[in-house]
Each structure stands twice: as structure tokens, then as C-alpha cells.
């Protein structure tokens, strides 16, 4: 039975069309007839403008926006490139806003000119991989943690590790009353964390990274002014924290014992084996948190702890027994799994099951585990969306050493680290790839990252992988490896990052540089022009090309002038030069 879509009642059409991505919706139905135009004008829209090129963005600005009611735009995802974020101020009724690639020079304007005008904004997510100035972040904090954003209930701040965040500029009188869920993915000192609690009185869910190098002696006394955080955040029921340089005994005194007793979930990650005593946790949790439903713990170490035996499964079971043989933990179904691998950069990982956060690092082979049921092992990593795998030299038989029963079904980002020391190791890419497919669902991956410019990756393995990633739109790769790619397998790529060891304004580079590096490790002006001329033939949907230098030399003082002279707007390519990050970005 067939029918024409336009024969459906308007109410049903309305519901159907709202499920179609807006860009596709307009290209299909706009100006088809007056009825469709009227429906398109009054739909509720959720625009995802991430990973679109300039022509697509211009279509959004010049065709879609004039044809719809701006008050019906509920949600917006956008990249901070080519001043695109300034279009946000048009959408006064926006309820949800996500910005990727936020740059420090736009933060103050975003905070003071854009966010304060979005009085209905309920959800805000900001992401940046760049170096952000502390004064700019402070300007943002002053707006977010105040009544200038009266409807904001959810806020995610995901910034790069170039420093820590403080809250010295916040106004105690003008504190936010609406904020319920807050995630700050940046390091924060304990004393700044306590200060933050004064400005978020209605918070229920809080995620933070905490550190302090001076938590002993007189400093601890300075933190003792408030004995119970319940007076500051009485509704807090969820805390997730990454802890660094804070011993378990100190964290218990200045953090855990001060938390509200009605906490429902406590999720912690640390690099200290001092947090690995189940008896200590039982004593704390059972006495302090009677309503706790979920306890999550991750301990990640780059070396095996001293005096710990890890040669056999029995050794690992012995380490985990204070958790896995405790009646308290068994009654709550809080099991602990231990992974040990001498080849990995993280050699010892203890975590509760299921693994509680989105990031996980491991190897494909030779990982030893404590005893765990097959079904529990199979489902342990359901929440992992970002996986890092370490490659190493030795060729290991998969039948004997494959990390059986672990499975990662929901990845969107896969990063390869390399401990391969030889350019041509004794290695079987085909065997590795086949084993990889049994552990990872490749069909969901959108981003793949070969992050280390000065390390070796097997070319054949890289090409096998790229052929098997149907949703891939982002690739981060050293240029010397990029030159070996079979690019026809990734023709739908939208974001490409090429990594170099050095930049040279001279082509060919100086002899000194060529003696140290290969020509494919050096970014030159001629190579930049060549990439811009040839990129579209390989990737017709490309939106962003990023060139980053991670080694000997960055961009010199004359480079900015060269860009202006050689990349006029006639090329229809915009660009940004981020000197502190040694990054050059082109937008198509």
C-alpha cells in the first residue's frame, strides 16, 4: 500500500517532519508548495551545525533562517569557527546550546553579549581543546554562576588541561538559583571547590576534578571552617570527582565526611593505590551514606604498586578480595575488576563494574584480570565511548592472549597510542584487525586518532581500519602517516587534523632540520598551499583542516603576514592562526 506524504493530515505531517534533520528537511520540502512552507515555518527546530562546511552554513543563514520562526528554535549545536557563534544572539528562545572548539578570544563576548540574552536557556555545553586564558574563563564563570542566566539548569564545561579553574570573581549575593547539574572538566583546587559550593545552593549533580599539592599541615586547617557541606548544597545527591595529589586519609577528612549524608551516587577516579582498600571504604560508606545506591571507583596506575603480586589470577583475586568478598559490597552488587598489563602505559587499573566513565585505556592482548563472570565481563564497558588502545612490538598469538570477553559496543572515539619501537616490527596487521573486530563495534566510531607524531603505526593496519568505519567523519593523524593512506575509503571525511613535528618557512627546510626529521614531518608554506589545492579532490565534504605543530619549532613571526598575502578571500577559505597552541585551521 502506497500513499503520498502530502495527503496526510497536517497534524501528522507536523510530527513526521520534526524527526527529519532540518538541513535535509529544507532541501527536500522547502518551496514544494505553500502548505509545506507554512508547516516548515512553524516547526520546532533542533539544529546541529557542527561539522558543516561554509556553503552549508550559508544555506542555514540565508535560506532557512529567513523562512522560519526564530522563537521555535529550541536547540543548537555549533562550532566556534569563523565567528559563527555570533549568530546565536538571533535565537532569543533557545533552550539548549552546545558549542565546540571554543576559543579564548570569543569567551568574553559569548558571556556578556550572547548568553545573558538567552533567558530561556536550560542547558549549556561548552567544549574547547585550546588554551584558554584564566581571565576569560573567569568572565564566563561570573555569568554562569549568577542570576543573569535565570533558567540554566544544566551546564557542562569541558576545557583542555592548560591550567586550573578558580571562582574568585563570583558574587555571593547574585548566586545562581536555577542550576541543578554541573560538570566542570578542568582541574580545581580543593579550596576553590569549597568556594564554588557557596554559589550553587540548589545543585543536585556535580562533576569536578580536584587536586591540591598542599593539603597537609596548616592548609588543612584553612579548610575547616565548614564541617558539613549540607549547609551549602543540601540537595546534592550525585558527586563524581577525579582526585589527584590527595591521599585517601586527607580526602576522607576534608571531602567525604563533609558531603551530605543523603548522597545517592559517589563516583571517584584517582591515581593512588591508597584508595584501593575495601575495608576502609566499607567503614566510610556504611556509616556516612545510608542512602547510597551507586558507588563507582577507578584507580589507574602507570606502574605496578610496590609489594603487590600480580603474576596470576589468584594474585589479582587477593588484591580485590577486600571488595569482592565483603558482604557489604556483595549486598550492594558493587564488584571490582582489576586489569594488569605490562605492555600498557596504564599497567594497573582497578575499577568497579560496570566501568563508570566514558574514557578507558587498554591493549588488545596480554591483559590479566581477576576472576569475573563471563556475563559481567562482557557488559563491563557498556558506558565507554572513548577508547585508547596501546600498540606494542611483540607479535602475540591471539588464541592465547586475546583479552577474551571484553566488548566495547558504544564507542564514538578510538585513539591509538604506540609503544612500537621499530619502524617495521614483527607484526600481523590482519590478525590484529580481526581480533580488534571481536572486541570493538566499529560501526559506531565517528573519530579516530593516531595522536603521536614521533611514534610508529603499521600502515596496513591503519588502512584496514579506515575501510571499516562507516560513520567516520573526524581523523587526527601525523602527516607522514597520512601520505600512506588510501583516501578513497574515507571520502566522506569532514574534519581532518594533520600533525607535524616542526614548521619551516623555507622550502626545502634547512639542512639542520632535515638531518633530524623526514620531509613528511615538516610543515612548509608550499605544503600548505598544496594541501588547500588538493584536499577537495579527496574529501568533497571537508569542513575543517587543522595543521598542528608538536615539536621543535612553531610558527615564526612572519607566518601571519604570509597567510594574509597568500590566502585572500578569493580562495573562499577562512582560517584561524592560534599561535599559543601552534595550530592553523582552515574552514571550507
Give each language-model segment a name:
Residues 1-588:
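Eukaryote-biased activation of long, low-complexity terminal tails and linkers
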Amino acid at each position: 500500500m502506497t500513499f503520498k506524504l502530502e495527503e496526510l493530515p497536517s497534524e501528522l505531517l507536523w510530527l513526521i517532519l520534526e524527526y527529519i534533520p532540518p538541513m535535509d528537511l529544507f532541501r527536500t520540502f522547502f518551496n514544494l508548495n505553500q502548505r509545506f512552507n507554512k508547516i516548515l515555518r512553524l516547526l520546532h527546530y533542533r539544529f546541529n551545525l557542527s561539522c558543516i562546511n561554509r556553503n552549508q552554513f550559508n544555506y542555514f543563514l540565508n535560506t532557512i533562517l529567513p523562512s522560519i520562526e526564530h522563537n521555535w528554535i529550541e536547540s543548537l549545536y555549533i562550532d566556534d569557527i569563523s565567528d559563527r557563534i555570533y549568530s546565536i544572539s538571533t535565537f532569543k528562545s533557545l533552550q539548549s546550546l552546545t558549542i565546540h572548539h571554543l576559543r579564548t578570544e570569543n569567551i568574553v563576548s559569548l558571556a556578556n553579549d550572547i548568553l545573558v540574552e538567552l533567558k530561556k536557556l536550560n542547558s549549556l555545553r561548552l567544549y574547547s581543546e585550546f588554551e584558554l586564558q584564566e581571565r576569560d574563563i573567569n568572565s564566563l564563570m561570573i555569568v554562569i554562576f549568577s542570576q543573569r542566566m535565570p533558567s540554566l539548569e544544566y551546564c557542562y564545561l569541558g576545557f583542555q588541561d592548560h591550567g586550573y579553574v578558580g571562582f574568585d570573581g563570583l558574587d555571593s549575593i547574585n548566586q545562581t538559583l536555577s542550576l541543578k547539574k554541573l560538570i566542570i572538566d578542568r582541574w580545581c583546587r580543593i579550596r576553590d571547590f569549597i568556594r564554588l559550593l557557596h554559589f550553587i545552593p540548589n545543585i543536585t549533580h556535580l562533576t569536578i576534578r580536584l587536586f591540591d599539592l598542599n593539603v597537609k599541615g596548616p592548609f588543612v586547617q584553612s579548610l575547616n571552617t565548614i564541617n558539613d557541606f549540607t549547609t551549602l548544597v543540601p540537595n546534592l545527591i550525585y558527586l563524581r570527582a577525579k582526585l589527584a595529589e590527595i591521599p585517601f586519609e586527607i580526602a576522607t577528612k576534608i571531602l567525604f565526611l563533609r558531603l551530605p549524608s543523603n548522597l545517592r551516587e559517589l563516583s571517584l577516579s584517582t591515581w593512588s593505590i591508597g584508595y584501593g582498600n575495601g575495608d576502609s571504604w566499607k567503614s566510610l560508606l556504611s556509616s556516612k551514606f545510608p542512602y547510597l545506591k551507586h558507588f563507582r571507583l577507578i584507580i589507574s596506575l602507570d606502574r605496578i604498586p610496590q609489594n603487590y603480586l600480580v603474576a596470576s589470577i589468584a594474585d589479582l583475586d587477593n588484591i580485590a578480595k577486600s571488595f569482592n568478598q565483603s558482604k557489604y559490597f556483595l549486598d550492594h552488587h558493587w564488584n571490582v575488576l582489576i586489569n594488569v598489563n605490562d605492555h600498557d602505559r596504564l599497567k594497573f587499573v582497578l575499577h568497579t563494574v560496570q566501568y563508570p566513565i566514558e574514557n578507558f585505556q587498554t591493549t588488545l592482548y596480554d591483559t590479566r584480570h581477576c576472576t569475573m563472570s563471563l556475563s559481567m565481563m562482557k557488559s563491563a564497558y557498556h558506558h565507554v565511548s572513548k577508547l585508547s588502545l596501546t600498540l606494542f612490538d611483540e607479535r602475540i598469538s591471539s588464541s592465547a592472549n586475546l583479552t577474551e570477553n571484553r566488548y566495547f559496543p558504544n564507542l564514538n572515539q578510538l585513539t591509538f597510542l604506540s609503544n612500537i619501537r621499530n619502524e617495521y616490527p614483527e607484526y600481523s596487521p590482519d590478525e590484529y584487525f580481526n581480533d580488534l573486530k571481536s572486541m570493538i563495534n566499529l560501526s559506531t566510531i565517528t573519530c579516530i586518532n593516531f595522536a603521536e607524531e614521533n611514534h610508529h603505526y603499521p600502515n596496513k593496519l591503519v588502512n584496514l581500519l579506515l575501510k571499516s568505519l562507516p560513520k567516520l567523519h573526524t581523523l587526527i593523524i601525523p602527516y607522514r602517516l597520512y601520505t600512506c593512506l588510501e583516501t578513497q575509503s574515507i571520502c566522506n571525511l569532514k574534519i581532518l587534523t594533520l600533525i607535524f613535528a616542526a614548521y619551516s618557512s623555507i622550502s626545502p627546510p634547512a639542512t639542520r632540520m632535515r638531518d633530524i626529521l623526514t620531509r613528511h614531518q615538516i610543515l612548509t608554506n608550499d605544503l600548505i598551499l598544496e594541501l588547500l589545492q588538493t584536499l577537495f579532490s579527496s574529501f568533497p565534504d571537508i569542513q575543517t583542516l587543522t595543521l598542528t605543530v608538536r615539536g621543535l619549532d612553531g610558527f615564526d613571526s612572519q607566518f601571519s603576514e604570509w597567510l594574509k598575502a597568500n590566502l585572500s578571500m578569493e580562495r573562499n577559505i577562512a582560517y584561524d592562526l592560534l599561535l599559543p597552541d601552534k595550530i592553523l585551521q582552515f574552514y571550507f
